[in-house]
Amino acid sequence: PEFYKFTNKLIPNKFPSLDKDHPRLLIPFRDEEGEVFAYQGRAFGNEQPKYLTIKLQDRDKIFGLDRVTKKEPIYVVEGPLDSLFLDNCIAVGGADFDRPLSIEGSLITNGELTVVFDNEPRNKEICKLIEKTINTGRKVCLWPESMKHKDINDMILGGYTKEEIQEIIKQNTFQTPLAQMRFVTWRKIND
């Protein structure tokens, strides 16, 4: 069914107008017990917005909680589809990692987090978020200059394997103070 119409069945009148309604890929966000607490509709074409996320409960939009092993290192990416290509990975449903990562204590017992932003070195907003994340002391992947794909999904479509991507991430993950030094170089390369 169309996305607005489907959503209105769950949350009456969430979309008062059904104008420009169209089918979308439905991506369920599940909690640790597997219960759906939100879902995201991804446009199949060039429709805007590309993503619409609907919360069914007042929880942070973290995708993959039902699949993550808390005692293992955890990757944190922007998009749910990207998270499906990495082992032990969650997604925050956008580029804003602040709120979801502020509850990381509830996510992790013995593991650690590595934040993997999309590869958008010319996006000033993403650069600010990367710098902010580095300054918190978290591990961050700074994609190599040779990587031309925008995100993990694009890398897969471009012929990279999951194992190759995970190795690239591993080789290009840094933490303070090395992350700060690498970020300065990375930003200059991509200015």
Model-found features: residue ranges?
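Replication-associated primase and helicase/ATPase modules
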Residues: 1-18, 28-33, 76, 108, ...
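Short, acidic/turn-prone active-site loops that include or flank metal/cofactor-
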Residues: 94-99, 118-121, 145-147
